[in-house]
């Protein structure tokens, strides 16, 4: 039923949700980046002429320093004995603490630019997107970089002069997760050797390489690849660490012979660690703790503790006698800048770790002071931007109590006194400088969030207005069908809302607000004007909707709905909440009056079994037994369904079903062989990969076409077709229990259809029972969430295991791997859309009734998550709150898509004893 009112709802709804989806990035995650700062040189007397930055991608701190037992040889040993010898004799070491997300791009940005890239970067992509801020490479004389095509280009393309950064990269196809990861690192060392050799044949190159201020960046991807493929406790991962340790002394010897001046500084670290499951991205300590070892020109030798110092994490390192100097990852950029005497990156927030520096205290203090001035420069530029766009400006309270100029004067006075021999003031000067840096960073956050309260109020009115606006349209479309034309707005309404709009738009204009802010304001003005004009429709529609129910029952229904929605909100953070709600729904048929014992018992059993999935760990470990069990259950359930519908199908359809069941069995066999081969480190058999893709394609595309040639329009037949169409694809993409969920989720919805049909048949009144529509909509929306959280959560997707795609795609291909992951996520929604479509037909609901009602209520979730967004703390928490908000705000549109998809999947389907069919 596509009338004017519904068209308005869809057009306004799509625009509203798309704009408000983006609102969090305009409000919460405005980039703190500022431009136009003056640079500050780290030191005029650099201790090193060049620097080698060696990054072991995905290398954990404990693996680097700990004594481990090799899983193949059984030998207990230190994997990196040479690096350990540096720590004990020649280097300063510590743990570099990363921030979340513990991914390659933000990790490298932090250590090379000294800047923790904000979440708004996710809107631009993270691989090929060049960094749009200053970096250590940008300040160097020249940078020679070797390694992965996922990392090197973003610093080359983002440099002020791209010719300043040279890159030597392997092709993406080189990143084969089933082959030896050591080859990736061997490429780096081999091409560095080639560069040195070429310089002996080219005088220009030789001159360029020997310039002061050069940087050599070695990006070693091997550990990350081995960790993803085989876990960080595997022989492959350990062997890769040993290979790196073997190559570093060779590298040092070649560098010393080539330059022959002992003026080279070396930094060895990692961008992030690796979880026990072979993933990273979240805030687990195994992901955030990385090694940092620094040696060479300008760097301190190890300092011995007067007494052994260790903790539970480091007790097996046998380094308790050596002082450990931990840093934040962004501090590495400041350290590297000092070592070769270049400017601090203009956007750096890193603090110079003076414990690593070998030099005069006055030089170190001067460098730290310039570090603080560089950060303060960002604050001053940002403050000027804010002052220029405000009617009234209120300065950050800590700088009101003590101005930044006062801080600078005090520090300069202390530095002057220290230079005159008062060395006892050094610690006071360092403490005061660090205090200035900390307050400056807090002030930057204050300026970035200066207009939060105003714009968040506008967005809140927008969400609440949409809820009432869409509910009024639902009432007009399905309950008060005699209301055709909208009520005319009164002159008072025009005057009031027009005045408010002019005033608020003027404020936005004065604040130099972007275009999106005007749209955020336009929607609440339109919604509340519409609500005010149609307030009589809202009153009469609610009265008709709850016709025949007592006031206390209305209150109970309202409380129940809000409780379910708030439970869903809580379930986004704690999946066990979905278990609780599913178990409560186990009594749903009995509460609604269904008294058939077999129906109720089967429903309770299925509900309890389905509820267990949200208790399982979202990060899964490959389990072939669970995959086998799920495949067997899918095959048995298909045979049982065929037995139940055998009288409704002809021989052609029966033969197609037999082929589909055979494809499920064949895919199970292919999955078994692929898993065994990959677990034995024998790679993916070519024939298994080809067979997997053939079955994948045939089941998803060929079989539906064969059914379409001679269609059977019975709804039970159509549901079985869809169930078997998706099953093979889901099996090969399953890591452990996902296919079991697929089987039980389908069983649950099939039973739900029959239960709702029985409830419908029990009603004798002629009037439309809107409470059943309400119940179906709420349960349907709940199942929309279960379809996602039943097999994982946001965090498990951000760090998904490669087992789910390596059986089809062993070569690294982020686009195709992402597409396969999305297919796996979408399949349960396809089943849900089919069942909602069947419910729509069996219960004689008008088309789009369910989606329209859900759309009017679902933004209860969006409003919750809007205020639950986090900008501080663990980046895992920050990322999850962003994803939760996006999932919630897209639920409205997704529900409509599901119902449209249901119409497509159920085209011409006939419900027995009903004359209605899909159009």
From Swiss-Prot:
Residues 31-457, 510-512, 575-576, 620-626, 677-687, 742-776, 829-848, 907-919 are lumenal. One of its GO terms (cellular component) is endoplasmic reticulum membrane. Residues 1-9, 479-488, 534-553, 598, 648-655, 709-720, 798-807, 870-885 are cytoplasmic. It is a multi-pass membrane protein. Its main location: endoplasmic reticulum. Glycans are attached at residues 90, 138, 198, 202, 286, 312. CDD domains: GPI_EPT_1 (cd16020). It is found in: Endoplasmic reticulum membrane; Golgi apparatus membrane; Vacuole membrane. InterPro entries: Alkaline_phosphatase_core_sf, GPI_EtnP_transferase_1, GPI_EtnP_transferase_1_C, PIGN_N, Sulfatase_N. Changing residue 302 to L: Induces auxotrophy for ethanolamine. N-glycosylated. One of its GO terms (molecular function) is mannose-ethanolamine phosphotransferase activity. GO terms for biological process: ATP transport; cell wall organization; GPI anchor biosynthetic process. Pathway: Glycolipid biosynthesis; glycosylphosphatidylinositol-anchor biosynthesis. Keywords: Cell wall biogenesis/degradation, Endoplasmic reticulum, Glycoprotein, Golgi apparatus, GPI-anchor biosynthesis, Membrane, Transferase, Transmembrane, Transmembrane helix, Vacuole. Its EC number is 2.-.-.-. Pfam families: PigN, Sulfatase. Target of the inhibitor of GPI biosynthesis YW3548/BE49385A. Interacts with CSF1; CSF1 channels phosphatidylethanolamine to MCD4 in the endoplasmic reticulum at contact sites to support GPI anchor biosynthesis. This is GPI ethanolamine phosphate transferase 1. It comes from Saccharomyces cerevisiae (strain ATCC 204508 / S288c) (Baker's yeast). The gene is MCD4.
């Amino acid at each position: 039923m596509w009338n004017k009112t519904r068209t308005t709802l869809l057009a306004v709804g799509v625009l509203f949700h798309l704009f408000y989806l983006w609102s969090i990035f305009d409000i919460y995650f405005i980039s703190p980046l500022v431009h136009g700062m003056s640079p500050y040189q780290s030191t005029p007397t650099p201790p090193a002429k060049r620097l080698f930055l060696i990054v072991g991608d995905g290398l954990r701190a404990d693996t680097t320093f700990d004594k481990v037992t090799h899983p193949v040889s059984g030998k207990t040993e230190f994997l990196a004995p040479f690096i350990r010898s540096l720590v004990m004799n020649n280097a300063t070491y510590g743990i570099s603490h990363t921030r979340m997300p513990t991914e390659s791009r933000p990790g490298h940005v932090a250590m090379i630019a000294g800047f923790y890239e904000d979440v708004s970067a996710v809107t631009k992509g993270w691989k090929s997107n060049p960094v749009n801020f200053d970096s250590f490479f940008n300040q160097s004389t020249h940078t020679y970089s070797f390694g992965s095509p996922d990392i090197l280009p973003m610093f080359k393309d983002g440099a002020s002069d791209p010719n300043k950064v040279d890159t030597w990269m392997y092709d993406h196809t080189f990143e084969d997760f089933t082959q030896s990861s050591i080859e990736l690192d061997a490429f780096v060392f081999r091409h560095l050797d080639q560069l040195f050799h070429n310089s002996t044949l080219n005088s220009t190159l030789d001159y360029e390489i020997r310039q002061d201020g050069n940087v050599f960046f070695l990006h070693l991807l091997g550990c990350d690849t081995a960790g993803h493929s085989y876990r960080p406790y595997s022989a492959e991962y350990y062997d890769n660490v040993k290979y790196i340790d073997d190559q570093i002394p060779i590298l040092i010897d070649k560098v010393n012979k080539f330059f022959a001046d002992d003026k080279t500084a070396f930094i060895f670290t990692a961008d992030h660690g690796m979880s026990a499951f072979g993933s990273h991205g979240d805030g687990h300590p195994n992901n955030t703790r990385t090694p940092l070892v620094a040696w060479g020109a300008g760097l301190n030798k190890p300092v011995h503790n007067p007494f052994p110092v260790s903790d539970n994490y480091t007790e097996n390192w046998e380094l308790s006698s050596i002082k450990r100097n931990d840093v934040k990852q962004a501090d590495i950029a400041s350290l590297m800048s000092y070592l070769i005497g270049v400017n601090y990156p203009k956007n750096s927030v890193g603090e110079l770790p003076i414990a690593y520096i070998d030099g005069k205290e006055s030089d170190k203090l001067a460098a730290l002071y310039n570090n603080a001035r560089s950060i303060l420069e960002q604050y001053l530029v940002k403050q000027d931007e804010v002052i220029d766009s405000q009617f009234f400006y209120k300065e950050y309270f800590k700088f009101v109590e003590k101005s930044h100029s006062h801080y600078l004067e005090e520090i300069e006075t202390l530095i002057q006194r220290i230079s005159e021999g008062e060395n006892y003031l050094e610690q006071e000067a360092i403490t005061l400088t660090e205090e200035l840096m900390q307050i400056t960073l807090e002030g930057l956050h204050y300026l970035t969030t200066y207009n939060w309260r105003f714009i968040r109020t506008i967005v809140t009115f927008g969400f609440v207005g949409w809820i009432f606006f869409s509910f009024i349209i639902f009432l007009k479309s399905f309950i008060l069908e005699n209301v055709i034309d909208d009520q005319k707005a009164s002159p008072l309404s025009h005057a009031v809302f027009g005045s408010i709009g002019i005033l608020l738009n003027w404020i936005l204009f004065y604040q130099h607000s972007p275009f999106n802010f005007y749209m955020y304001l336009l929607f609440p003005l339109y919604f509340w004007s519409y609500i005010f004009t149609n307030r009589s429709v809202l009153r009469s529609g609610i009265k008709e909707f709850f016709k025949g129910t007592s006031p206390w029952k209305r209150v109970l229904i309202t409380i129940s709905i809000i409780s379910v929605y708030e439970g869903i909100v809580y379930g986004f953070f704690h999946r066990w909440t979905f278990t609780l709600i599913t178990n409560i729904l186990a009594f749903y048929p009995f509460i609604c009056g269904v008294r058939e014992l077999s129906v109720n018992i089967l429903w309770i059993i299925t509900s309890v079994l389905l509820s267990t999935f949200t208790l399982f760990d979202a990060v899964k470990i490959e389990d072939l037994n669970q995959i086998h069990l799920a495949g067997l259950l899918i095959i048995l359930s298909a045979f049982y369904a065929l037995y139940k519908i055998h009288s409704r199908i002809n021989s052609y359809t029966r033969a197609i079903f037999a082929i589909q069941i055979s494809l499920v069995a064949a895919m199970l066999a292919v999955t078994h062989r692929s898993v065994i081969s990959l677990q034995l480190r024998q790679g993916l058999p070519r024939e298994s990969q080809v067979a997997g893709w053939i079955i994948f394609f045939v089941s998803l595309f060929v079989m539906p076409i064969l059914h379409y040639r001679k269609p059977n329009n019975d709804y039970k037949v159509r549901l079985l077709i869809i169930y078997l169409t998706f099953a093979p694809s889901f099996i090969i993409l399953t890591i452990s229990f996902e296919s079991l969920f697929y089987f039980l989720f389908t069983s649950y919805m099939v039973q739900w259809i029959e239960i709702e049909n029985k409830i419908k048949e029990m009603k004798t009144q002629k009037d439309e029972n809107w409470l059943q529509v309400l119940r179906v909509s709420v349960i349907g929306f709940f199942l929309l969430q279960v379809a996602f959280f039943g097999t994982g959560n946001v965090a498990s997707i951000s760090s998904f295991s490669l087992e789910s795609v390596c059986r089809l795609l062993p070569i690294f291909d982020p686009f195709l791997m992402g597409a396969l992951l999305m297919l796996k996520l979408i399949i349960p929604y396809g089943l849900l859309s089919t069942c909602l479509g069947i419910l729509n037909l069996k219960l004689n609901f008008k088309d789009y009734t369910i989606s329209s009602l859900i759309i009017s209520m679902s933004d209860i979730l969006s409003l919750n998550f809007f205020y639950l967004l986090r900008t501080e703390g663990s980046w895992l928490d920050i990322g999850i709150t962003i994803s939760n908000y996006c999932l919630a705000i897209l639920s409205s549109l997704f529900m409509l898509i599901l119902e449209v998809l249901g119409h497509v999947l159920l085209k011409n389907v006939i419900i027995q004893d009903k004359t209605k069919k899909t159009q």
